[in-house]
Amino acid sequence: MTALFPFDNSYARLPSHFFGRVAPTAVEAPRLIRLNRALAVDLGLDPDRLESPEGVEVLAGQRVPEGAEPLAAAYAGHQFGQFVPQLGDGRAILLGEVVGRDGRRDIQLKGSGPTPFSRRGDGRAALGPVLREYLVSEAMHALGIPTTRALAAVTTGEQVIRETALPGAVLTRVASSHIRVGSFQFFAARGDVEGLRALADHAIARHDPEAARADNPYRALLDGVIRRQAALVARWLTVGFIHGVMNTDNMSIAGETIDYGPCAFLDTYDPATAFSSIDRHGRYAYGNQPRIALWNLTRLAEALLPLLSEDETQAVAEAEAALTGFAGQFEAAYHGGLNCKLGLATTRDGDPALAGDLLKTMAENEADFTLTFRRLGEAVPGPDGEPDPAAVEAVRSLFIDPTAYDRWAGGWRRRLKDEAGDAAARRQMMRAANPAFIPRNHRVEEMITAAVERQDFAPFETLLTVLARPYDDQPDFAQYAEPPEGGGRGYRTFCGT
């Protein structure tokens, strides 16, 4: 019989100080909550075998599968601006890598027991955070945003002790890699240039193979990471996503959203929104995410200085030149995304101001971010040049002062006259850019409460079904598109895992 996972491991071939070898710790009574069968097929795996007793034992960390070389990766990181020279995988174990339809992917267990980097922790994960990451990462994938994926969630039959006793769980996470900005910082902080070079060469081979042919491969690697992060954060903003804990150890060089601990989505639009209970000063607020991304990338550039050039002055110049490109790349991606949300297929000089005026009006009038843009798509002028009155009223109703929307909408309709194409095509373009369904924070909390307190996973399954088609109208699930009463004010998230 073939192996459950056809592992082809590369990170485990790196020097031994890149990680600690550690096996998952067995649990009492593993039970499969859900297997992502479609993802399993994409990875070249047999979903029926993964759902078998043997497969569930592997997904729970009960059994180490053939070909696995389990390890916990070492990394450092800035956490809320403060540097910690050693962090590492404290509750996650990389089983190995497989090569599927979309290339090489890591298979990692989160919550599978203590590692050399657990820092007195138990290495376990609670059920609520596991379900949150499964749900939100799969929702982000459906939204078209680069992200780690969830292959499976398993309950352990054990409790984990946090503020209270909670049911334990294990998440099987899939990622293009788990190399972080903090991975490079780990070696830079130790003056380990050879370790830094080995990691960079591995990253180039895995994520930027064309960089190997560049005049300065390490500058090309840095450019690639900057480009991917600029595009990623722009996409976050266009769907109202707030990561919540953008520490350098939570930034993937692959350009995927990773580590969903205290994540959330905007309800009422306010760029100062920060939901995380530990982000007391709003460092990682919604509107601050581009600035923090650049701050993190600057830390990456600093770590790479010894590789950019043997001449320190030249190395700094290379780093600064690379970092200078972030703003333009982010702005192009962000405003391009906003133009799509407004039904604008072409670009004009005044477009950023038009979008900015709408966002300002939304903030002043406490309008819901997702609903405003979705309903705007139904309020585009028709073939006769006039919008549907009912559709216009549906948008206006979201604003405290509907006339404020009217004042903005006049300029928007004038701008639409510059566009070619008919109203139906424009409406379709906007529907593809403006989701009807996001993981509404209150719905996520209801789902977690049902699972943790009543062992009821039906809300989890329903949300997964709805969020798999975020851009489609789903009349039977219309309630899942609605914001909470009060616009979600006072909502708080917790790292949890």
Swiss-Prot record:
Q: Which family does it belong to?
A: Belongs to the SELO family.
Q: What is the lineage of its organism?
A: Bacteria, Pseudomonadati, Pseudomonadota, Alphaproteobacteria, Hyphomicrobiales
What protein name does the entry list? Answer: Protein nucleotidyltransferase YdiU
In this protein, the active site sits at 249 (proton acceptor)
Binding annotation for ATP: 88, 90-91, 110, 122-123, 173, 180, 259
> In which residues is Mg(2+) bound?
250, 259
Alphabetical list of PANTHER family matching this protein = PROTEIN ADENYLYLTRANSFERASE SELO, MITOCHONDRIAL
Catalysis: reaction(s):
L-seryl-[protein] + ATP = 3-O-(5'-adenylyl)-L-seryl-[protein] + diphosphate; L-threonyl-[protein] + ATP = 3-O-(5'-adenylyl)-L-threonyl-[protein] + diphosphate; L-tyrosyl-[protein] + ATP = O-(5'-adenylyl)-L-tyrosyl-[protein] + diphosphate; L-histidyl-[protein] + UTP = N(tele)-(5'-uridylyl)-L-histidyl-[protein] + diphosphate
